[in-house]
């Protein structure tokens, strides 16, 4: 059983304690969970890998909302003038609001959080201004813990009728299973009953009230992440575990399911193997549950992964490699959005370490909050650059196709692009040795021209590009992400 982990984010029934720190200014965050010890030094050895790409075997279409980001109303810099450009350049197609566990205490009409700090300039309309500038879609988490169906329906009316924002995706609550039902409490929930049965019953009421205002919206149900605590545990008062109970009651009334993924990596290598080791099984389990309980509507019920991040190495190169692997593996397995936690998260500067020659501030943000120990506000951390590499691989509407590698040390993703081009992402997970990668293709014959190659290298602060190698042989630097762009033979 996986223990309930308290990440560097707001996950408390007493959010005031966490966010009193935010009142002190940028760079203050909730104390973090334990961080895995640095990996032992690795003696460089040659890495050789083969990667086969089947351009005719489609896995998924790159969704417009695939690359997502979380923002939180306690972040006074969430709408900073630099933010829209940074998000747009990273290919951000979805932005989630009002911020994790804060959602279950957030009242949109008064722009307040029960017991919590709300930064000036983070109102819903200001958020929507940023989202529209980015060209992304909002994902809204309605207040289940201390709200009502009527309050949520009022938000839909304001957003989509009064303002015409066209907000499509609405989650009902955040990590509601953390309400004490299973013995751990980090999520606000004022309902007398904390059972999955109660949540599902109320979820149906929320869906009815909100869709009465705008039938075109999509409603998401909070599920536990398959294989992670408390998945599989039957709580007191429920007939089955959380997921089976919720979907048996509400499965026919929802449009997507919601999970979060914070893999626990006990070393750098362990973390970097998690996307391939965990995501396919999780996604298959979710799809099986949907097929079982959603009836004839099952093909239309999506999977939303509305929070992801690593549990360690947050601001250093391992997380820069983890990010694109995480996003793309979820998309390949059917998720329509994968949302990084968080835009800015902050740090108290008490857990600064050195990882692969760079400072790690234990800050869960993808951009610096500008704390005293950190680089300037909005400086991108490695996960930002790793995520931005996805824009070199493909765009919404392109097709993710099968790419298989011969060794876990090098992961691969491929996209068949509009117009017939192909792009391949290679992630070298060895921190010390370059990888020589031999590539082969089915359903695509590459041009003999030297390909364009984009790269994000260890501890770099930008993405580089060059023409190098061939379509069938590339050298991938240690701890780097490269994208090889190929044209078809004419």
Segments and roles (model prediction):
Residues 2-38:
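Secretory targeting and sorting signals
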Residues 42-255:
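N-terminal catalytic cores of secreted or lumenal carbohydrate-active enzymes
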Residues 75-78, 102-106, 147-148, 177-179, ...:
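Flexible loop/turn segments at secondary-structure boundaries
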Residues 155, 195-327, 332-333:
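Noncatalytic carbohydrate-binding groove/subsite architecture in carbohydrate-active enzymes
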Residues 305, 310-388, 392, 398-411:
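Aromatic/acidic polysaccharide-binding cleft in carbohydrate-active enzymes
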Residues 406-445:
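Carbohydrate-binding surface patches
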Residues 442-461:
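Solvent-exposed beta-hairpin/edge-strand motifs
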Residues 467-490:
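C-terminal beta-strand-rich structural cap/linker in extracellular carbohydrate-active enzymes
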């Amino acid at each position: 059983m996986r223990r309930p982990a308290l990440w560097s984010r707001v996950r408390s029934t007493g959010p005031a304690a966490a966010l009193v720190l935010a009142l002190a200014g940028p760079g203050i965050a909730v104390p973090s969970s334990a961080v895995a010890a640095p990996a032992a030094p690795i003696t460089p050895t040659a890495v050789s890998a083969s990667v086969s790409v089947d351009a005719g075997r489609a896995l998924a279409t790159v969704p417009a909302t695939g690359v997502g980001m979380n923002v939180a109303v306690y972040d006074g810099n969430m709408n900073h003038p630099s933010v829209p450009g940074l998000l747009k350049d990273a290919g951000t197609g979805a932005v989630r609001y009002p911020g994790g566990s804060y959602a279950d205490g957030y009242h949109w009409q008064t722009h307040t959080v029960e017991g919590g700090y709300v930064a000036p300039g983070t109102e819903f309309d200001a958020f929507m201004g940023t989202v529209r500038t980015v060209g992304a879609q909002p994902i809204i988490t309605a207040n289940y813990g201390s709200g009502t169906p009527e309050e949520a329906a009022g938000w839909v009316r304001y957003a989509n009728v009064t303002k015409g924002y066209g907000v499509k995706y609405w989650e009902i609550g955040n990590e509601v299973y953390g309400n004490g039902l299973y013995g751990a409490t980090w999520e606000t929930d004022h309902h007398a009953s904390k059972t999955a049965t109660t949540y599902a019953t109320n979820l149906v009421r929320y869906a009815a009230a909100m869709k009465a205002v705008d039938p075109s919206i999509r409603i998401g149900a909070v599920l536990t992440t398959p294989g992670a605590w408390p998945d599989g545990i039957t709580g007191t008062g429920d007939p089955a575990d959380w997921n089976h109970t919720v979907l048996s009651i509400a499965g026919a009334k929802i449009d997507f399911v919601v999970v979060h993924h914070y893999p626990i990596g006990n070393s750098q290598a362990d973390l970097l193997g998690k996307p391939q080791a965990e995501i396919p099984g999780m996604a298959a389990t979710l799809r099986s549950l949907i097929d079982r309980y959603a009836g004839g509507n099952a093909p239309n019920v999506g999977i939303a992964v509305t929070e992801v991040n690593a549990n360690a190495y947050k601001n250093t190169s391992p997380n820069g490699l983890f990010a694109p692997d995480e996003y793309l593996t979820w998309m390949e397995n059917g998720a329509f959005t994968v949302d990084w936690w968080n835009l800015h998260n902050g740090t108290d500067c008490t857990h600064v370490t050195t990882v692969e020659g760079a400072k790690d501030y234990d800050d869960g943000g993808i951009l610096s909050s500008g704390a005293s120990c950190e680089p300037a506000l909005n400086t991108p951390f490695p996960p930002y650059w790793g995520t931005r590499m996805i824009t070199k691989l493909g765009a919404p509407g392109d097709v993710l196709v099968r790419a298989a590698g011969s060794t876990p040390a090098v992961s691969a993703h491929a996209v068949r692009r509009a117009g017939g081009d192909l792009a391949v992402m290679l992630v070298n997970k060895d921190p010390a040795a370059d990888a020589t990668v031999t590539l082969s293709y089915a359903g695509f014959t590459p041009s003999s021209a030297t390909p364009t190659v984009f790269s994000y290298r260890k501890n770099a602060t930008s993405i580089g590009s060059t023409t190098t190698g061939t379509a069938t042989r590339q050298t991938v630097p240690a701890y780097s992400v490269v994208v090889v762009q190929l044209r078809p033979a004419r």
